[in-house]
Amino acid sequence: MVNMKASMFLTFAGLVLLFVVCYASESEEKEFPKEMLSSIFAVDNDFKQEERDCAGYMRECKGKLCCSGYVCSSRWKWCVLPAPWRR
């Protein structure tokens, strides 16, 4: 009888411990995406604030030179990829 009470107590304690570990793991997983998104947007804002001396793809090139690998379209005045059919 005592052995059965001890095994029931250990089983119950194990289930409680399992519940606590799962709850802690789940709460950490809920915070992870929020932290990841906030860090991504923080990095994105740093790049937006950076001023460039050249114009990137599909940017207006009237007052600026296009970045390397792009040419200024004579028709649209945008920086585009160089191609044989573009003059």
From Swiss-Prot:
Expressed by the venom gland. Disulfide bonds join 54-67, 61-72, 66-79. This is U3-theraphotoxin-Hhn1l. Ion channel inhibitor. Belongs to the neurotoxin 10 (Hwtx-1) family. 51 (Hntx-8) subfamily. Hntx-8 sub-subfamily. Residues 1-24 form the signal peptide. Its main location: secreted. One of its GO terms (molecular function) is toxin activity. InterPro entries: Huwentoxin-1 (IPR011696), Huwentoxin_CS1 (IPR013140). It is found in: Secreted. It comes from Cyriopagopus hainanus (Chinese bird spider). The keyword Signal applies. One of its GO terms (cellular component) is extracellular region. Keywords: Disulfide bond, Ion channel impairing toxin, Knottin, Secreted, Signal, Toxin. Residues 25-52 form a propeptide.
